[in-house]
Every structure is written in structure tokens, then in C-alpha cells.
């Protein structure tokens, strides 16, 4: 292999290796000139690529403010918006509330006519079973967890929930059996709400208990809209007036929207993805096997995040003008969410075990995520075994050890309690971490991003903000004024335009070394088996949000065509 010398351009650049190029570890470099070149390459990259603190207490980002600084190999082409937005004319300037659900329905019919899942959401969003279904299989399946104890700050009693449990059972027995689940949005406690259209909007930090019934359906049984119990913070129940109960669920869905966008989506996949990408560029030479393995999955994160910070998360962007938590609350939300982040929560088998999701027979996200993780893990292990011939090779790879320390420092902010490794001692430790990186930046991102239009297109199902404060008493809400809590017309349009743009995958993929084709074919084989297994869910109560259907739109092509070189 000839020596490739980087020119002194002013942008960050990576080079895709040709099909007959050599990929190797530093210890395998036999030519002194090549070893010296690796050192020189990394010195040059570290001078060009630096770190920047975007928000104190959150993962760091690349020190670049313009996409033009990235160069052609770290940017990508975006397809046109996925839906026709001409119908928004006449709506985008209306800084007023929706007049009725009928007006919303007319608006939606223009918008959702080609989205069968969105139509299904509109038809069933009021139903308790569908509320529980979304917690498991919607665009944010990362909040639900099994609980064996009622939170001490939730004013729920056994007698209160008795009508919603099996006839011969008690709350204590259901907790012991593992059929009680919890949504807790305490990260929103005390977060100031946004001012939109010169009007104060409102947030809540609800707690919601759900029960897995004998038919296998997960249904909400109690909702408390604020963290601190008291006479002005009642516990809403399914037996309450219909509009009271529906409004309580809408408040939960609004809180979920905030946590989904900033924690599940932006933090876990985008910000951490940027950390993985920046660390890879700074610490791994382009002939390192992990550079070649990881870069197809992470290279677009820099462009996406730079654009997000310059538009979506900037003054006059959608977070400033249309989202309940707003720009002023961004530091609190991201720093709090980062403090709660752990390495275990990013690793699918550990996360599912910790949240007790194996007990949910219709949690298709859990089932699919575990299968995709397992296939990815086998795939990564085979690639690791191609280049590392034992644990000692892992320990002695100084480039690899610098890479993981950089991630620990700038991604997990040197917090030992995060559980992020500071070094790798074994091939299995390395395989697990690399699997996590690929899963987070491909399959997980597909699950929390590409299903947004399915579940958020009917806005009352996932309101981005609320224009009236949470109710402090029961019996004050009617069908006629329920919609008055929802965001204004123009902010609704802003959110939908943004979600439409975010729901479109990148258009280009890379071609890579044919050395890996045999390993990739094994991965494809296990992936196809999984696609077949998801087809047996016709008895499910709703179209499965199945991770794999979403994964095929983004991580499927990315995992498969980029490594085999068979894509467009």
C-alpha cells in the first residue's frame, strides 16, 4: 500500500480506502515509514479537529460551527422532504389556538392521507391500550420501566387502584408479580416553560403507573401531573370523567415529547454519536479497522449536529418558537439527562434487563432491539477477531486505548458512575462497546427518529407544548375546551415541518473493503431471519412499530450496503 499524505486543506477530511487497500493495527505495520505516517496523520488531525463545550454538563461537540469546515467526506446529501407541505399555506402565520378538533381533523386529512400508521394513531389515540402500546413501541420506547415499589412522592393507594386490577388481586400482589410499570418524568421538575407567540406555555413533570392486564395489554391506571403530592395535584384515574382522564394522558404525552426530543433522540444518538465520530477522527488513523468499521455509521453526525445547533437549537429556531421547554431550558434538560445516563442504559441487553421489559409480551421494540443487537454483536465480534488475535492485542493497541479514553473524557465527562470503560482489557469488552456505538447511531436512531411522523402527525397525541396550566382539580374540563390546551396553529406547523425534515434519511452510502464481505453476509442472513419473524405479528392490536421496519429505512441500508459496497 502506498503512503497517502493529507494535503493542508482548511477542512476536516477523511479518505475512504480503495477495495485493495490494507487495513491493519499499528502493531501490524511492518514498514517504519508507514508507522511514522500514522503518527503524523494523527498529529495533523488533532490540530484540525478539536473539542467544544456546547452545554456544561452535557457531552462535548466538535469545534466547528460551519458545515463547510467538514469537507466532502464528512458531509452528505439529504433527500427532499417526505411529505407535501403545500397544504400548510394559510396556517403557518396563524398565531392562535385551534378552533376545534374538527378543524384539526381537516388539517390532518391533508397531512396524513398517505400515512396509514398516523391514521391509526388518530383513530385510537384516546384509548388506554394504545397509550400503553406507544410507551412500548412508539417513537420513545426508552422511558417505560417495571417497578416493584410505588414512588414515595406519588399519592396512590391500593384501594384507589383496586377497580383496575384483577378481581382477586391487590396492588401489592401486582407489584410483586411485576405487572406494574412506571413512567417518571422527574427530569422536567422545575424546568421553566417557554413563551410562544408572546404567550406563556406550561410544562409538567408527571408520574404515570401502568398495569399489564391478563390479556397482555399495558394500560395506564394512575397519573399524577406534578412530582410533589398535594391537594392541588390530584391523582387522575380511568374512572374519572372522560375529559379529565384524556387531558391527564395528554399531559404525559407532552412531557414525553420533551424527553424524547432532548434525551432519547438528541442526547443518546446525536450528541453521543458526535462524540464517537470526533474521537474516531482524532484518535484512530484511517487504516485502523475500527475506523473503517465505525465511520459509515457516524460520519454524518457532525454535519447534522452543526446544522441543528445553527438552526433548530438556535434563537428563532423550532425549539425557541414552538417547543414547550424552549431554549432557556435546554441547559437544564441536557445536563440533567446526561447526569442520568449510564453505559448500561446504552447497551440493549443490560437496559432491557434493568427496565424489566421482558415481562411485556407486546413490547416489540424490546424484542426487535435485542435481536438486532445480537446480530450486530456477532458481526462486530467476527470483525474484531479478524484483527485482534487475543486479549493482549486489545490491551496493547495504544490507538484504541486513546480512543476509548477520549470518549470517556468528552462523552461521559470522566464520571466513573456512568460505567463507561476507560480502557479495554478484552476482545469481548471491545466488541460490546463497538456494538453499542453502531446500534446507537443506526438502529436506535432509526427507532426514535423515523417513527416520529407516524406518532406525532396527529398533534393531540404528542403535543409539543401546552397553552394552559395543568388542572388542579377534577371535573373542570369538557370536550369543548379540551383542545384549548393544545399548541397554536403556527407552532403546530413548525413542529410538523421539522419532523418531516428529520424523518428523511441521508441519500448516500459508502463502499468498503471486500475483506469483510463474508462477515457481512452472515450478518445479513441473521437479519433476514429476523425480518421473517416480525411478520408473524398479525394478531397484534396495532401495526407493530417494530424497530426493524424503521431500521430498514436507515440502519438497514447503512449496515448492509455500505459494508458490502452494493448500495447506490
Task: Label each residue range with its predicted role.
Residues 1-568:
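Long, compositionally biased charged/polar stretches
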Amino acid at each position: 500500500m502506498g503512503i497517502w499524505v493529507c494535503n493542508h486543506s482548511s477542512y476536516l477530511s477523511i479518505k475512504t480506502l480503495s477495495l485493495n487497500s490494507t487495513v491493519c493495527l499499528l502493531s501490524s505495520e511492518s514498514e517504519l515509514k508507514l508507522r511514522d505516517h500514522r503518527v503524523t496523520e494523527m498529529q495533523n488531525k488533532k490540530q484540525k479537529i478539536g473539542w467544544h463545550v456546547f452545554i456544561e454538563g452535557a457531552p462535548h461537540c466538535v469545534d466547528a460551527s460551519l458545515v463547510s469546515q467538514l469537507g466532502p467526506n464528512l458531509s452528505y446529501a439529504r433527500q427532499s422532504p417526505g411529505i407535501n407541505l403545500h397544504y400548510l399555506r394559510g396556517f403557518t402565520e396563524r398565531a392562535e389556538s385551534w378552533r376545534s378538533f374538527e378543524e384539526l381533523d381537516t388539517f390532518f386529512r391533508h397531512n396524513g392521507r398517505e400515512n396509514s400508521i398516523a391514521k391509526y394513531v388518530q383513530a385510537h389515540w384516546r384509548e388506554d391500550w394504545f397509550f400503553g402500546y406507544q410507551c412500548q413501541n412508539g417513537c420513545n420506547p426508552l422511558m417505560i420501566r417495571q417497578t416493584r415499589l410505588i414512588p414515595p412522592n406519588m399519592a396512590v393507594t391500593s384501594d384507589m387502584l383496586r377497580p383496575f386490577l384483577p378481581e382477586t388481586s391487590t396492588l401489592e400482589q401486582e407489584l410483586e408479580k411485576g405487572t406494574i410499570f412506571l413512567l417518571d418524568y422527574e427530569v422536567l421538575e422545575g424546568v421553566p416553560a417557554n413563551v410562544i407567540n408572546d404567550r406563556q406555555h406550561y410544562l409538567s413533570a408527571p408520574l404515570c403507573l401502568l398495569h399489564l392486564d391478563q390479556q397482555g395489554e399495558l394500560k395506564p391506571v394512575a397519573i399524577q401531573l406534578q412530582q410533589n403530592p398535594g391537594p392541588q395535584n390530584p391523582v387522575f384515574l380511568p374512572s374519572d370523567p372522560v375529559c379529565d382522564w384524556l387531558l391527564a394522558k395528554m399531559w404525559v404525552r407532552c412531557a414525553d415529547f420533551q424527553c424524547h426530543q432532548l434525551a432519547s433522540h438528541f442526547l443518546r444518538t446525536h450528541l453521543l454519536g458526535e462524540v464517537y465520530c470526533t474521537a474516531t477522527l482524532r484518535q484512530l488513523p484511517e487504516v485502523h479497522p475500527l475506523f473503517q468499521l465505525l465511520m459509515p455509521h457516524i460520519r454524518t453526525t457532525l454535519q447534522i449536529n452543526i446544522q441543528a445547533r445553527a438552526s433548530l437549537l438556535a434563537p428563532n429556531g423550532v425549539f425557541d418558537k414552538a417547543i414547550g421547554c424552549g431554549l432557556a431550558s435546554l441547559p437544564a434538560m441536557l445536563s440533567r439527562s446526561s447526569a442520568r445516563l449510564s453505559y448500561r442504559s446504552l447497551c440493549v441487553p443490560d437496559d432491557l434487563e434493568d427496565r424489566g421489559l421482558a415481562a411485556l409480551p407486546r413490547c416489540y421494540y424490546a424484542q426487535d432491539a435485542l435481536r438486532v443487537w445480537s446480530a450486530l454483536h456477532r458481526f462486530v465480534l467476527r470483525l474484531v477477531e479478524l484483527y485482534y488475535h487475543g486479549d493482549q492485542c486489545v490491551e496493547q493497541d495504544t490507538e484504541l486505548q486513546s480512543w476509548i479514553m477520549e470518549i470517556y473524557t468528552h462523552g461521559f465527562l470522566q464520571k466513573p458512575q456512568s460505567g463507561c470503560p476507560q480502557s479495554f482489557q478484552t476482545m469481548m469488552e471491545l466488541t460490546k462497546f463497538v456494538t453499542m456505538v453502531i446500534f446507537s447511531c443506526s438502529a436506535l436512531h432509526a427507532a426514535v427518529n423515523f417513527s416520529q411522523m407516524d406518532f406525532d402527525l396527529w398533534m393531540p397525541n404528542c403535543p409539543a407544548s401546552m397553552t394552559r396550566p395543568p388542572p388542579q382539580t377534577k371535573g373542570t374540563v369538557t370536550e369543548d375546551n379540551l383542545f384549548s390546551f393544545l399548541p397554536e396553529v403556527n407552532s403546530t406547523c413548525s413542529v410538523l415541518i421539522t419532523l418531516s425534515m428529520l424523518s428523511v434519511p441521508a441519500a448516500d452510502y459508502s463502499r468498503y473493503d471486500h475483506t469483510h464481505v463474508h462477515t457481512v453476509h452472515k450478518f445479513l442472513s441473521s437479519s433476514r431471519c429476523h425480518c421473517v419473524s416480525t411478520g408473524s405479528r398479525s394478531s397484534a392490536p396495532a401495526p407493530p412499530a417494530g424497530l426493524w421496519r424503521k431500521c430498514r429505512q436507515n440502519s438497514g441500508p447503512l449496515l448492509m450496503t455500505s459494508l458490502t459496497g452494493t448500495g447506490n
